[in-house]
Amino acid sequence: MPYLYRAPGPQAHPVPKDARITHSSGQSFEQMRQECLQRGTLFEDADFPASNSSLFYSERPQIPFVWKRPGEIVKNPEFILGGATRTDICQGELGDCWLLAAIASLTLNQKALARVIPQDQSFGPGYAGIFHFQFWQHSEWLDVVIDDRLPTFRDRLVFLHSADHNEFWSALLEKAYAKLNGSYEALKGGSAIEAMEDFTGGVAETFQTKEAPENFYEILEKALKRGSLLGCFIDTRSAAESEARTPFGLIKGHAYSVTGIDQVSFRGQRIELIRIRNPWGQVEWNGSWSDSSPEWRSVGPAEQKRLCHTALDDGEFWMAFKDFKAHFDKVEICNLTPDALEEDAIHKWEVTVHQGSWVRGSTAGGCRNFLDTFWTNPQIKLSLTEKDEGQEECSFLVALMQKDRRKLKRFGANVLTIGYAIYECPDKDEHLNKDFFRYHASRARSKTFINLREVSDRFKLPPGEYILIPSTFEPHQEADFCLRIFSEKKAITRDMDGNVDIDLPEPPKPTPPDQETEEEQRFRALFEQVAGEDMEVTAEELEYVLNAVLQKKKDIKFKKLSLISCKNIISLMDTSGNGKLEFDEFKVFWDKLKQWINLFLRFDADKSGTMSTYELRTALKAAGFQLSSHLLQLIVLRYADEELQLDFDDFLNCLVRLENASRVFQALSTKNKEFIHLNINEFIHLTMNI
């Protein structure tokens, strides 16, 4: 089936209750469950089968996994036992500590947890071997349905499991997230903030502990109170350091959850503490304020109880905040709203969302370092009209997320290095060209270009109009992206790449024979020689005429014009509908062709006989066609070669078809200039003649 275009642009920020059905059957969780109950069967998910394809894509299991339902592993399975808590999360044989750290943080926010794990499921009445979970993806909530067959070895769960062997919510949640991303293997390696955002639809913020503000403790305290999800880790300098244990019992390159922050009285002083959890369920900090450290002997039983202090090897531990800053390198916070943690006020934020793509050859221009292509990136107009309350500037947050890179890992895709720049917008209401960026500096930009799924930063700018340009660092790199803009006051955003405007002059009337130029007289003689008495040429004859003339032109390198091009030319110029070209029609086309040749030569900078697809937007606009990025992408796919170049024959074909389509549309849109109405016969007739 052909690709169906869906318009990009601003979208509403969805709420979880609108979670979209994702199962290939098109049925909801409840519909499939009722169907299984009526049939007396347990659900088997054909979309994510109990087979190796759901486990790995680049390797085979080293041990013979057996897929079993919880009721085949234990006698009395429970979905959630005594509430979903962080102690229900123990890492298995999969390198997805980042996901487990995010799940542990999720359990601290019951409202967010209930959104991800719907409460309408259990192993009790109504059990049919089917469960579902809801995740946020690129500004929409998805309902992911799975069966409850889990990979086991010797009757033990291989991957994520609960400390209580008859509790299965965490293992099933991991399976649903693996399905969302294509396989269990796709979950290897990552950042906790990624899953935190998928659990909440929140906004990411990262702090370097060594460069954190003076009120860093208060920032983390406020984040936990607001229900934000927090993770932390220690940087590694090489692959060899990954999961290396420090002398203090901490693991480098390993994702931890921040589960609490508090103060304790110790020898007349208030000591700031922070509680951390290792998703392994063991291996803990062994320094000051660790589970068995002597400091706790100076703390009364009531205070110890309040802080839930126990000397258990459960992976959770307290440490002094100053030690935390000294040993950990980064803290990732997923805020459920964009309110700055440095401020006390809570605001109502306006959100707009843009879905877009970087496509090689048309919109994958790279960063400003690559001036020749940077201007071809998607451009979004941002209108800031209202100042913040009591301020002279407008606050907003920009979050740029590249889509589905984890899902595409099986095809060799990596997380790209991304960022964005913001420019003051000139009065022109159009896609800005190369010269604008040659002479204008950005007004603001992301702090860095980095290979993370999302890059987000806060800004304050005076009211006005700006152009926001999201890009990869290197040009020619392809990805889809989701751009979210949060503003305290309503900001108007518009995609500058979606406009289509055709400006074609009326075709000139042919000159009478006695007023023909010397060039036209030579054409008439050649035409008579080829066409005969009727003075009409077929596509084959037109091919001969054009190539005979163009080969004498020394200023353009080109291969012969193809027969297809000549058929398209006749389709454009043939007013009688007999499939041939009369001499007067040819004269009109020749004038047009000379203009197009000059246009091609203008953009064939190196005189190689080809032009870059990145120049296509400007070249087509000069010919009268202002096209959307989506149309440009289709043209590049159809006409460009592997080196993203077009020769003259391809360029001519493109222009002929564009003009033909435009003139047909103009002829049919008599009442409404933006729409035409066709029945199936008219539509097919139209497409066969363009």
Curated annotation (Swiss-Prot):
The active site is at 97, 254, 278. It comes from Homo sapiens (Human). GO terms for cellular component: cytoplasm. It comes from the Eukaryota. Residues 42-337 form the Calpain catalytic domain. Ca(2+) 4 binds at residues 604, 606, 608, 610, 615. This is Calpain-9. Belongs to the peptidase C2 family. Ca(2+) 2 binds at residues 284, 291, 312, 314, 316. Calcium-regulated non-lysosomal thiol-protease. Ca(2+) 3 binds at residues 574, 576, 578, 580, 585. Its EC number is 3.4.22.-. Keywords: Calcium, Hydrolase, Metal-binding, Protease, Repeat, Thiol protease. Residues 338-521 are annotated as: Domain III. It is an enzyme of class 3 (hydrolase).
